[in-house]
């Protein structure tokens, strides 16, 4: 389709406690599409022609051409309107965890978002993402107990760990996609 209409969920707040508004959604999508400065941050959002606020809970996005990947691209982060450059140094979002710190070459620390919209989540108080230089180092850190999860095991690593760790595997080609046929109503 060429026009997408989104209704904001009630009770969604940013990590700083402020309500998420249509102005925030408009700003974030226009910024990501390059409508504010001519530099798109998300290539598939370049097709956005306009983002219009219909009322206090509804945003309408108009694109110039049908794009089967567009829906996937709407998962772009919604940030407070006008946050711009500050968004990189002091990120504020709506997810289950909020930014605490980032140390280059070491990792990022996130804390539980007490304002998260989905009741009962998150159930963890903190998540630490550790930057590890190689798969072999990550395997050693997992075995040594300094990390709890490692998502990208090779088959040989999984076999090595299966007797002492809960190794969960599933077939995947690492491609996840939803494509809509925009040649026919109601999506054309």
PLM regions with names:
Residues 13, 30-37, 115, 143-147, ...:
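Sec-exported extracytoplasmic/periplasmic mature domains
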Residues 18, 23-31, 72, 125, ...:
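Solvent-exposed, polar/charged alpha-helical surfaces in well-ordered, non-transmembrane soluble domains
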Residues 72-128, 136:
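Gly/Pro-rich hinge or "lid" segments in bacterial periplasmic/extracellular proteins
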Residues 1-38, 60, 188:
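Aromatic- and charge-enriched surface segment that lines or borders ligand/interaction sites
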């Amino acid at each position: 389709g060429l026009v997408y209409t989104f209704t904001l969920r009630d009770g969604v707040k940013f990590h700083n406690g402020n309500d998420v508004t249509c102005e925030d959604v408009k700003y974030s999508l226009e910024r990501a599409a390059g409508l504010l400065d001519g530099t798109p941050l998300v290539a598939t959002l370049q097709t956005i022609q306009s983002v219009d606020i219909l009322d206090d809970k509804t945003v309408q996005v108009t694109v110039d051409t049908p794009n089967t990947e567009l829906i996937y691209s709407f998962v772009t982060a919604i940030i407070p309107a006008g946050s711009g450059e500050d968004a990189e140094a002091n990120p504020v979002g709506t997810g289950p965890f909020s930014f605490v710190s980032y140390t280059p070459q070491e990792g990022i620390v996130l804390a539980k978002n007490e304002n998260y919209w989905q009741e009962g989540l998150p159930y963890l108080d903190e998540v630490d993402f550790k930057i590890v230089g190689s798969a072999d180092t990550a395997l050693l850190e997992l075995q040594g107990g300094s990390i709890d999860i490692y998502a990208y095991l090779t088959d040989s690593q999984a076999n090595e760990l299966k007797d002492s760790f809960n190794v969960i595997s599933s077939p995947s080609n690492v491609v996840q996609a939803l494509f809509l046929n925009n040649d026919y109503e109601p999506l054309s």
